[in-house]
Amino acid sequence: MGASILLILALQAVGPAAQLPTEVVLRVSGAVSQPLALSLQDLAAMPRTKVTAKEHDTTVTYEGVPLTNILQKAGAPLGKQLHGKALASYVLVTAHDGYRVVFALPELDPDFTDASRQIILADTANGKPLPEKQGPVRIVVPQEKKGARWIRMVESIEVVKLP
């Protein structure tokens, strides 16, 4: 009987297989048709990609969702919708500490840029969740020479149309 109780307690301590948190880690808003509130679980269910890049003299393989996929899911004007006044749209990415970076919407759209340019919202580095000081999600821009737009602890993405 004692062994049975120990087994039950051990199984309860281990619990079911680890699941990703369902709390919202990212909000997408602004000039989109479908504002989003995404959890790590939501992001894990989206099409993913890996990019390998140098950061502080270290080569890191990041995995996450292409930023364009998130913008498409939110209904941002991309592809054939990105013309005329919509070309003056930009994406404002904000971190937990208030740090912000801007991307012109056309520079993110594969119809306007080299398809090999993959800007991703990463949630893992070298197969592990991002450290607390970087995550839970961050933007990775592997082709840029400076890391100023590699924004950590991303909380929101806003699509803004200039008047």
Task: Describe each region flagged by the PLM.
Residues 2-12:
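Bacterial N-terminal signal peptides
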